[in-house]
Swiss-Prot record:
Activating cyclin for the cyclin-associated kinase CDK10. One of its GO terms (biological process) is regulation of cell cycle G2/M phase transition. It comes from Homo sapiens. It is linked to Toe syndactyly, telecanthus, and anogenital and renal malformations: A syndrome characterized by anal, genital and renal tract anomalies, facial dysmorphism and syndactyly. Features include anal stenosis, a rectovaginal fistula, clitoral hypertrophy, a pelvic right kidney, toe syndactyly, and telecanthus. Pfam families: Cyclin_N. This is Cyclin-Q. Associates with CDK10 to promote its kinase activity. Interacts with SALL1. Residues 1-21 are annotated as: Disordered. Keywords: Acetylation, Cyclin. The modification N-acetylmethionine is found at residue 1. Silencing with siRNAs phenocopies CDK10 silencing in increasing c-Raf and in conferring tamoxifen resistance to breast cancer cells. GO terms for molecular function: cyclin-dependent protein serine/threonine kinase regulator activity.
Length: 248
């Protein structure tokens, strides 16, 4: 099973003239593979987020040139399934990955090549656990975003809420944030507020009575959050979408 040449990466890594650095291109494309493979495997959103986070964290600790990023990605999916108690068979991960890279190809036979790949995934999982010092449980923004959306829905005019897909957009922004390493650079609560902030900005939705309030709506959700933090997260999100247009 051959992976295509890597491309796309975390928004923080930019090369000359603002172009994505080579490492960033690889990580973006591999994260996209994790998400698409995860969907085909029937993974829930949290296990997929965990797989992406494990992948990004591993390469924060190691050199990209030393490891096959797609093998690391497959092992991340396998490990995330264990961490989030949605266990996956290595055979299914291999078959889905093979179909991803070879859409018109035949399923892999249970031959020596298959068993070598299976053993590589298992051995790679053990390597990753050691590199990450067995710290593979993460706090994701999802539960915070759900809480914030419920609160915001109660604040907003019902008509405004129903005619604009703020919630759908916020969830999409959160999902796409895992193409980069935002999950490692920012607190989960801050990311949840930032994607909600950006979703409101996209549709021009204003929170009622914000002008008269003692503090902005987003600080009600999180006292230690500042506007520069939101701006940094939003900037990284925008760079992710910019990178998406640059990478086939």
């Amino acid at each position: 099973m051959e992976a295509p040449e890597g491309g796309g990466g975390g928004p923080a890594a930019r090369g000359p003239e603002g172009q994505p650095a080579p490492e960033a291109r690889v990580h973006f494309r591999v994260a996209r593979f994790i998400m698409e493979a995860g969907v085909k495997l029937g993974m829930r959103s949290i296990p997929i987020a965990t797989a992406c986070t494990i992948y990004h964290k591993f390469f924060c600790e190691t050199n990209l040139d030393a490891y096959d990023p797609y093998l690391i990605a497959m092992s991340s999916i396998y490990l995330a399934g264990k961490v989030e108690e949605q266990h996956l068979r290595t055979r299914d991960i291999i078959n889905v990955s093979n179909r991803y890279f070879n859409p018109s190809g035949e399923p892999l036979e249970l031959d020596s090549r298959f068993w070598e790949l299976r053993d590589s995934i298992v051995q790679c999982e053990l390597l990753m656990l050691r590199v990450l010092r067995f710290q593979v449980s993460f706090q994701h923004p999802h539960k915070y975003l759900l809480h914030y959306l419920v609160s915001l829905q109660n604040w907003l005019n019902r008509h405004s809420w129903q005619r604009t897909p703020v919630a759908v957009t916020a969830w999409a922004l959160l999902r796409d944030s895992y193409h980069g390493a935002l999950c490692l650079r920012f607190q989960a609560q801050h990311i949840a507020v930032a994607v909600l902030y950006l979703a409101l900005q996209v549709y021009g939705v204003e929170v009622p009575a914000e002008v008269e309030a003692e503090k902005p709506w987003w600080q009600v959700f999180n006292d230690d959050l500042t506007k520069p933090i939101i701006d940094n997260i939003v900037s990284d999100l925008i760079q992710i979408y910019t990178m998406d247009t640059e990478i086939p």
